[in-house]
Amino acid sequence: MERAREIGEGSASSLREQRNLREKERRMRMKHLFSILSSHVSPTRRLPVPQLIDQAVSYMIQLKEKVNYLNEMKRRMLGGEVKNRSEGSSLLPKLSIRSLDSIIEMNLVMDLNMKGVMLHKLVSVFEEEGAQVMSANLQNLNDRTFYTIIAQAIICRIGIDPSRIEERLRDIIS
């Protein structure tokens, strides 16, 4: 009888040990997986597990949105489709020139799929027309390129002819 009890007790303790061992292995595996997740999400600092999971979820959502955006861009580029996201039915490039006294401001919006225009070419047009460039900026946002040039007439009495500058700029961008 005692022998049966020992075997019964032995098997019960053996099952308990196996359960404990499996639980320990599971915890070790989860700890390893969380450390991998932490290295991908925030490699600079250690976060508690709940914050780590929240940050990982938001990071995955951002990545999914980025993949969708890039797939859409790829589809448009491969399809040769040039889509205008701005309001109205105006086509890009969009050039606007404003002049006030001896100061002239040029704004140009182009699609990235269009022929590239070098900023120095635009600046040289202003300089050749007798203007001193005060500011020249180039920005790339999403699928658009924005050029802004602000110039001032070198000789205020002579001034600058905005129509001539606009004509020359249109020749460059077309």
From Swiss-Prot:
Gene Ontology biological-process annotations: regulation of transcription by RNA polymerase II
Gene3D superfamilies the UniProt entry points to: Helix-loop-helix DNA-binding domain
Coiled coil regions, renumbered to chain: none
This protein's UniProt keywords: DNA-binding, Nucleus, Transcription, Transcription regulation
Keyword set includes Ribonucleoprotein: no
SMART domains for this protein: HLH
Main localization (coarse): nucleus
One of the record's GO cellular component terms: nucleus
Subcellular location: Nucleus
Domain bHLH span(s) in chain numbering: 14-63
Family: Belongs to the bHLH protein family.
Name this polypeptide is given: Transcription factor bHLH168
Organism: Arabidopsis thaliana (Mouse-ear cress)
Gene: BHLH168
